[in-house]
A protein has these predicted regions:
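Aromatic- and acidic-residue-enriched segments that line the glycan-binding/catalytic groove
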Residues: 30, 63-75, 103-144, 203, ...
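Carbohydrate-binding surface patches
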Residues: 374-408
Length: 535
């Protein structure tokens, strides 16, 4: 498995909508809108994103999935030079680029199909299209028949058994890799594509770029048919997409627990597939419009980021933006967004997702850990992931009241909540009784008990919770330096709590840093540990 994908946090953008392009590609001038993406890079970095999946960017008639030319950037977005600049800036910022590969079908304005329309039987491109024949007309008024994608005759199915077609498509992909340095492809309508084409595509891409990632859009069926050593690396996890939101709406965690265990548990059928996980996208109603209770938004994303696979956030949904299809149209799901004039947004949700992204980056169990269910109830769910000698628990409570969840932990270990201020939970007789507030979650790392500083007096008659407080005294930084904490102050304007500390050997060296930074967990040598630990 490629190392980068196990650490990936995706941000999905539909460029034509995001950039405010006209809905139809009329015969107008080329306009550079795609460079708008560059302005969003600081936001992506703040959110913890390290990979973007961009919807169609190549010349098309309307929505991008009706390609006119695989070798040209859509003139509503810009040109190859502008897109090369965007990809370069993303890569400089440590963000990988995955493009939409629409190879099952093209639009009716695709140049080779236009040749067939103009030259009929005399066109050398008749063999480029699936089941094209002159034995009857098409529903679009052509004097010939052709296969279309799911009956949409504005989307003409390509004949991927034709070597000329395959060479044309691979030539385009090769130019995207060479010119833009792309890191992967999302394959549209993958269930309709000839498997032999995927074999050729895999061989072609991996030869040019061994860590190139291929992910197929699969809605139904056995994911192993497409994601295997001969074809694709991954698929869209629509099974869990549905289970995640409906489990919260129906207050029934058994639904998503069944899917997670079926896919990734002991004997899981997709344990060898690093699935692409999401809670909304350009084709389905936005999460904020689907969830019946907005209080569940944070738990949904906590589940998304802590389950096996690569999490993806659809642009705008990090702020809880709504979006519902209208009259069968997907365009309301694909708005133009301006960072400087956003509608009312949920900043708390965005900060929560940023925190989850950091945990994904730092915690090996969230990258490659196995999956084991610990507690499954209608309104509570606990699962455990382990890798690299570390174990991590996710505990979710969707109820409107607090919950207490009891389960066993490894002897000699305590649990540290790396999502919530590093609270420490100590077991009693090998089990921990974990309190979880309404509509909330905990993400807990198992740590050796002797590594955790405990107060001298602990009242074990109460729930064994030892809050991680910043008290005056000596602390060791994870890099080995020692500092003397003087206390906690507040910023005079923002009122943000700041930890004030100094060098014990040189009192002239004084620092004031955000409390949240002081308490956070960092990845040091492949292991998660507190940034500062009291001596």
């Amino acid at each position: 498995m490629m190392d980068w994908i196990t650490k990936a946090v995706f941000y999905h953008i539909y460029p034509l909508g995001f950039c405010g392009a006209p809905r139809f590609n009329a015969d107008g001038e080329r306009v550079n809108r795609i460079e708008k993406l560059v302005d969003w890079i600081p936001h992506l970095k703040e959110l913890g994103v390290n990979a973007v999946y961009l919807g169609p960017v190549f010349e098309s008639s309307e929505h991008g999935y009706d390609t006119k030319d695989y070798y040209q950037i859509d003139k509503r977005l810009g040109d190859r030079h502008a897109f090369r600049t965007v990809c370069g800036r993303l890569h400089e910022s440590g963000i990988r680029v995955v493009l939409d590969g629409v190879f099952n079908h093209v639009g009716r304005e695709f140049w080779a199909f236009r040749d067939v329309q103009q030259n009929g039987r005399g066109s050398r491109y008749c063999g480029w299209f699936h089941n094209l024949s002159f034995g009857g007309g098409s529903p679009m008024g052509d004097p010939f028949w052709y296969d279309a994608w799911e009956g949409h005759f504005n989307l003409v199915k390509l004949n991927l058994k034709n070597p000329e077609v395959v060479d044309h498509l691979l030539g385009a992909v090769g130019s995207w890799i060479q010119d833009f340095g792309i890191d992967g492809l999302r394959l549209d309508a993958a269930d309709c594509v000839d498997p032999d084409f995927f074999r050729r595509l895999r061989s072609f891409c991996k030869e040019k770029k061994p860590d190139f990632w291929l992910m197929g859009e699969i809605i139904h069926g056995d994911y192993n048919r497409w994601a295997n050593p001969e074809m694709l690396d991954s698929v869209t996890n629509y099974e869990c997409y549905k289970g995640i939101y409906s489990s919260h709406n129906d207050k029934n965690y058994f639904e998503i627990a069944y899917s997670l265990n079926r896919q990734f548990g002991d004997g899981g059928i997709y344990k060898n597939i690093y699935t692409y996980n999401f809670v909304d996208n350009h084709d389905v109603n936005r999460l904020a419009s689907v969830l019946r209770n907005p209080e569940h938004l944070e738990n949904v994303y906590t589940l998304l980021f802590t389950m096996p696979g690569a999490p993806s956030v659809y642009y705008g949904s990090e702020w809880g933006l709504p979006g519902i299809k209208e009259n069968g149209s997907d365009w309301p799901l694909r708005p133009c967004l301006d960072l400087h004039s956003l509608p009312p947004v949920n900043e708390k949700l965005s900060r929560h997702i940023a925190k989850l992204s950091r945990l994904k980056e730092m915690c090996v169990p969230l990258q490659t850990g196995d999956y084991r269910q610990i507690v499954v109830k209608n309104e509570q769910l606990v699962y455990r992931r382990e890798a690299g000698g570390q174990a991590l628990y996710t505990a979710l409570n969707l109820a409107d009241g607090p919950a207490s969840l009891g389960f066993g932990v490894t002897p000699g270990k305590v649990l540290v909540d790396v999502l919530n201020h590093h609270q420490v939970f100590s077991p009693v007789n090998g089990s921990v009784e974990l309190p979880v507030e309404p509509y909330s979650a905990r993400v807990l790392l198992e740590r050796d008990a002797y590594e955790i500083h405990l107060p001298e007096a602990v009242d074990f008659a109460a729930p064994p919770i030892i809050p991680q407080e910043v008290e005056p005294g000596l602390y060791r930084h994870f890099k080995g330096h020692e500092y003397e904490v003087l206390g906690v102050a507040r910023h005079t304007e923002t009122m943000e709590p700041l930890v004030v500390y100094r060098d014990p050997q040189d009192h002239q060296k004084l620092w004031a840093r955000p409390l949240s930074m002081f308490l956070e967990t960092v990845n040091a040598g492949g292991r998660c540990q507190p940034r500062f630990q009291k001596l």
